[in-house]
Design a protein with these regions (language model features):
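Small-residue-biased structural context
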Residues: 1-174
Length: 174
């Protein structure tokens, strides 16, 4: 009678332990010591939001013609984007490269994104280097305005495509 009661809803199964124990996953991508982390994608998405927030502060400071504050936010942005790119390159791309080895289409897509991100990263860092002294160089204001707008468009587009297309490829290897 206990089985029928369980099947037809008279008894509830105790799921508290099942909820507390994570599902078993392989600890590393094949051939690496890079482990799958269920927290990685939420962390990267949070970093994206932080980067966009700092970028908004750069825009706001520049709009107020506060070049000193603009320079400080540019340095904050540099620090955050370098950290983000390092995390993506080490924990995300290397893991994907090894875990997608049997999925050539997805692997090819990941390589395209990685090459594009490397180019974007270099361009953004060149932008940051070019304008690091904007706080003491008001003559930088006009070209900075145009370049800032371009970087903003590239950043927003890249984040959107990364989160919609690339991040779903990250999953545990069994």
């Amino acid at each position: 009678m206990g089985l029928f009661a369980f099947l037809f809803g008279r008894k509830k199964k105790d799921t508290s332990q099942a909820l507390q124990q994570p599902a078993a996953v392989a600890s590393h991508a094949p051939g690496t010591q890079i482990a799958y982390s269920p927290d990685l994608i939420p962390k990267l998405k949070t970093e994206h939001q932080q980067l966009l927030e700092i970028f908004g502060k750069i825009n706001a400071a520049f709009a107020k013609n506060d070049l000193s504050l603009t320079a400080r936010f540019l340095e904050d942005f540099r620090r955050e984007i370098q950290s983000h790119l390092l995390t993506e390159n080490i924990r995300f791309y290397i893991y994907l490269e090894h875990s997608l080895v049997q999925h050539m289409e997805s692997l090819s897509l990941m390589h395209e994104f990685r090459q594009e991100m490397n180019a974007i990263g270099k361009a953004v860092l060149a932008f940051l280097n070019k304008y690091k002294d904007i706080g003491t160089r008001p003559d930088f204001a006009l070209p900075f305005s145009r370049d800032l707008e371009d970087v903003g468009k590239i950043l927003v587009d890249r984040i959107k495509r990364e989160e919609e297309t690339l991040y779903p490829l990250y999953f545990p290897v069994y």
